[in-house]
Curated annotation (Swiss-Prot):
The lineage of its organism: Eukaryota, Metazoa, Chordata, Craniata, Vertebrata. Belongs to the anaerobic coproporphyrinogen-III oxidase family. HemW subfamily. It comes from Homo sapiens (Human). S-adenosyl-L-methionine 2 binds at G99, T100, Q158, R170, D195. Keywords: 4Fe-4S, Chaperone, Heme, Iron, Iron-sulfur, Metal-binding, Mitochondrion, S-adenosyl-L-methionine, Transit peptide. Residues 1-17 form a transit peptide. May be a heme chaperone, appears to bind heme. Homologous bacterial proteins do not have oxygen-independent coproporphyrinogen-III oxidase activity. Binds 1 [4Fe-4S] cluster. The cluster is coordinated with 3 cysteines and an exchangeable S-adenosyl-L-methionine. SMART domains: Elp3. Pfam families: HemN_C, Radical_SAM. This is Radical S-adenosyl methionine domain-containing protein 1, mitochondrial. Coiled coil: none annotated. Residues 34-270 form the Radical SAM core domain. [4Fe-4S] cluster binds at C49, C53, C56. The gene is RSAD1. PANTHER family: COPROPORPHYRINIGEN III OXIDASE, RADICAL S-ADENOSYL METHIONINE DOMAIN-CONTAINING PROTEIN 1, MITOCHONDRIAL.
Length: 442
């Protein structure tokens, strides 16, 4: 397949060559020379699906008719506009999510990447991820996405049980999933991630562990475990509400998660985030930006972003949400160059709350250096060092606070939500009192 432009062809070839030379061995790769405010990840939302899954409440639509050329033009325009408004000079990763972006034309993916390459620097080892569903991504189509510049796939496998797949409203079978996974690994060796869900109605620990063991015979170097969340407004929620299905058992889900983590550790996977496991250094660079509270631009209907617009003097980060409905979003992009519906300036405390809640999702946690990038006056020791409730969490081995920073233990990662019930109020209280003290041993 031909790409729409020689620059995109050259960039895709360079990316593939760099990918052969080396793998990303740590989160974020080599330090970038640009200041943090000039760097960002880019998320591109494709809002369309073949059908709505029974558990999903994401911003997605079943198109009655689709003029992809118009959608492509608007995605390109909004990407260019947001890059200009943000002053971002280096894009460190691109993630095509949805919806089902594997339903988009590879030409659309190539056009977006070409536009971004014209507006910002793209490193040769740029991670470009595409979410794919097995039924919308036969091998020939995956190869075309590779030619367009995609070098990493995230496959929504969800289950290897056909009964569970039907319950979830998925359009693929377990055989479809494994066939697509095998083809993806052939085309993108070492760069394929799969999702596996747990905590479904009537799901039992033993059969689910059997699925995980089976998946280990087929998967690549990245795997995500996600617990089902029953969302109001979904078909699955309604079935549980009216008693047609049993409510998921949270204790069984917790056991699945704990035993699943142990199985993956024995298989050589490193848990680098609450839901994510990797081996051979195959971490998700794009998602790492989220967990480290880096800047990211959200392009497409309903996309979310976090960046400092140039008009704000480059000092106030904003949370941004694009217009949800695709037709309205396209009208706004054609009129204004972007479809931003909501802008919320983030105060310093709000930003620190995000740094805390997101950073503790990772095994690295929050280093002192990283914290000081967001709050140079109030240290982690100031906030958490003398609090009795936090000390109890440290003594129970759920948290660690030392010369490296603040992080969860292996046991603590599994109960992070409960830890944040203590940590976030303590941060808020310390912020109100703000009386920095010397660092122990400093």
């Amino acid at each position: 397949m031909a790409l729409p432009g020689a620059r995109a062809r050259g960039w895709a070839a360079a990316a593939r060559a760099a990918q052969r030379r080396r793998r990303v061995e740590n989160a974020g790769g080599s330090p970038s020379p640009e200041p943090a405010g000039r760097r960002a990840a880019l998320y591109v939302h494709w809002p369309y699906c073949e059908k709505r899954c029974s558990y999903c409440n994401f911003n997605k639509y079943i198109p009655r008719r689709l003029e992809e050329a118009a959608m492509q033009k608007c995605l390109v325009t909004e990407a260019q506009t947001l890059l200009r408004l943000s002053g971002v000079q280096r894009v460190e990763s691109v993630f095509f999510g949805g919806g089902t972006p594997s339903l988009a034309s590879p030409h659309t993916v190539a056009a977006v990447l070409e536009a971004v390459a014209q507006a910002a620097h793209l490193p040769a080892d740029l991670e470009v991820t595409l979410e794919a569903n097995p039924t919308s991504a036969p091998g020939s189509r995956l190869a075309e996405f590779g030619a367009a510049g995609v070098n990493r796939l995230s496959i929504g496998l969800q289950s290897l049980d056909d009964t569970e797949l039907r319950l979830l409203g998925r359009t693929h079978s377990a055989c479809d999933a494994l066939r697509t996974l095998a083809e993806a690994r052939r085309l993108f060796p070492g760069r394929v991630s799969v999702d596996l869900m747990l905590g479904l109605p009537a799901q039992q620990v033993g059969p689910w562990l059997g699925q995980l063991q089976e998946l280990l015979h087929h998967c690549d170097d990245h795997l995500s475990l996600y617990q089902l969340s029953l969302e109001r407004g979904t078909a699955l929620f309604a079935q549980v509400q009216r008693g047609a299905l049993p409510a998921p058992d949270p204790e069984l889900a917790a056991e699945m998660y704990q035993r699943g983590r142990a199985v993956l550790r024995e298989a050589g996977f490193h848990q680098y985030e609450v839901s994510n496991f990797a081996r051979n250094g195959a971490l998700s660079t794009h998602n790492w930006t989220y967990w480290q509270c880096g800047q990211y631009l959200g392009v497409g209907p309903g996309a979310h972003g976090r960046f400092m617009p140039q008009g704000a003097g480059g000092h106030t980060r904003e949370a941004r949400i694009q217009t949800l409905e695709p037709d309205n979003w396209m009208k706004e992009v054609m009129l204004f160059g972007h479809g931003t519906r909501k802008r919320v300036p983030l105060g310093r405390l709000e930003l620190l709350e995000e740094v805390l809640a997101l950073g503790l999702r990772t095994d690295v946690g929050i280093t002192h250096q990283h914290w000081q990038q967001f709050e140079p006056q109030l240290t982690l020791w100031d906030v958490f060092g003398a609090n009795k409730e936090v000390q109890e969490l440290l003594e129970r081995g759920l948290l660690q606070l030392d010369h490296r920073g603040l992080r969860c233990s292996w046991e603590g990662l599994a109960v992070l939500d409960s830890l944040l019930l203590t940590l976030l109020p303590q941060l808020q209280e310390a912020w109100q009192q703000r009386t920095p003290s010397p660092v122990p041993g400093g």
